């Protein structure tokens, strides 16, 4: 699971290493599942993939039960992933709707793993949305090469939107236990640098 997250989200992977082993393990399982669903949309390559995916899915369900993830989060995430099967070019409205599942729901799951109360969900969604938007900016050329256009060519609009959502999300930082805030702050710093390099 650790290896999958390192490959799938190396920026965030580097940041989470400060967290306790139990939290890291659960986050690895979460991100492995996110990757599996993404790969399912792209297609199954082999019987080996199916066996590996089954293990990932089983471990994710253990994490989901442990933290009582809401069914709506999973539905929104799956909906966003399967949107990629038929929608290749997004407007601002459809991109933000995509973020609802691809990143906002993941933000809520992360918040539960970190021990945050439901009151933190609004801020977790804003932070997840911010991260997704700046990832779209960073990966623009790669996504275009795959036939996807999540954002328009004027990246300054999306960089501003990233900053606005990051600021809003950070208003809920106090919901995260103080000893667990470091990796979030480190991730923010990394993504802010991406924004500065892209602006």
Predicted regions: what they are:
Residues 1-131, 137-199:
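Catalytic cores of Mg2+-dependent Asp-rich isoprenoid enzymes
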